Regions:
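"A position-specific structural signal for the A-helix of alpha-solenoid helical repeats
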Residues: 4, 8-11, 44-48, 85-93
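Short coil/turn linking the two alpha-helices of tandem helical-hairpin repeats
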Residues: 7-16, 49-55, 98
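Outer membrane beta-barrel transmembrane domains
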Residues: 34-42, 47-53, 57-74, 78-80
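Extended amphipathic alpha-helical interaction segments
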Residues: 1-43
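Alpha-helical junction/boundary sensor with strong preference for TPR arrays
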Residues: 26-36, 68-73, 94, 101
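Alpha-helical repeat scaffolds
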Residues: 17-31, 56-69, 107
């Protein structure tokens, strides 16, 4: 219930006056939901982040949901339908976000990796391709 209230606090001007910080409240609700095996608060966080237009919060919502949806964190059987609906909500928000920015829906890794994420540059690549990308040491270069 607190996650739902927090979403309302973010969406309706003046509704959050005198209330706790809405995103902190949603994060607390997400932790409770993870322990109980229900990720509805994650979906509400994604919806609120989408409505706010804050890319950082939206990506955090996607990554938080993905981290909470691993095989070692199964859904509570009593609330499987609600959990499944929450997953569909997050996937729908992700698909819309991806489509607006890239023209295609979110792929399998679309909740954790994004099109503009910087790739880690690995110097190990040169070790395996024979060093073709690296300059020869000065001693092996012809004198000028």
């Amino acid at each position: 219930p607190m996650a739902t209230r927090a979403v309302i606090w973010t969406l309706l001007p003046g509704a959050g006056d005198g209330k706790p910080a809405p995103y902190a409240t949603m994060k607390e609700s997400m932790q409770i939901g993870e322990k109980k095996g229900v990720r509805l608060a994650h979906a509400l966080y994604a919806v609120a982040a989408q409505a706010s237009g804050d890319d950082a919060k939206l990506r955090d919502a996607f990554r938080s949901y993905a981290a909470a949806s691993t095989e070692d964190k199964p859904a509570n059987p009593q609330f499987r339908l609600i959990d499944k609906m929450a997953g569909l909500m997050v996937r729908g928000v992700a698909d819309r976000y991806w489509t607006e920015n890239t023209g295609v829906r979110a792929g399998d890794e679309g909740l954790t990796t994004f099109w503009d994420d910087k790739q880690e540059d690995s110097s190990l690549d040169d070790l395996f391709d024979g060093g073709s990308g690296a300059e020869a040491p000065a001693e092996n270069q012809p004198a000028e």
